């Protein structure tokens, strides 16, 4: 974690530590989303979180993915996978952590769900999809690899395919009470598990214009919308026609 304001350099060692963190965190993973344990910031904050989550889910629902072939990157325990399946999509979910895939498998199974264990920093899609969804992953992609990540989005889509990205805004209330966010120009932080173990992870907050520009470099025209406090959402199309959340 940088204390000087200079950007952190992220190498393979940091990425390996990040993966180890998510593998070890599986039993605590949902606490962040449900605002329990160390993530409970009080009734008012939880109510705002839930309202803003409902807004984001509404933006995803508006894409009308029924019958679509959807790629989900880094699904974790499946908190958003269930919505995609409920919408009638066929979902291929790719995650590097086998423990997360086991948790997802325990949450939901069915003929429209395929699970793939793979490193998303090296994985390449076997085919093109109608849509790519990545919920709370892009902030864990370092600057050194963000261009390649956007190219992965592009390579995964049919012409006219849709991208849906959601991630956290930089707010202290979003993370655990015992976590410290990186400097504004930094991209790594230390995360702590309930048992006291600590890990370095990437946490890179990107501005709206920066995100739109990175998508454009990969041939995706995107627009960005924010909720009041917690979430940044980008929606775009590969063929250059922007799709706004509604």
PLM region spans:
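Class I SAM-dependent methyltransferase SAM/SAH-binding core
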Residues: 69-122
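A conserved beta-strand element that flanks and buttresses the S-adenosyl-L-methionine
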Residues: 133
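Conserved class I S-adenosyl-L-methionine
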Residues: 2-64
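Conserved Class I S-adenosyl-L-methionine
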Residues: 201-238
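Short catalytic micro-motifs in class I SAM-dependent methyltransferases
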Residues: 136-140
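A short glycine-rich, Lys/Arg-flanked "PGG" loop and its adjoining helix->strand segment in the class I
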Residues: 147-159
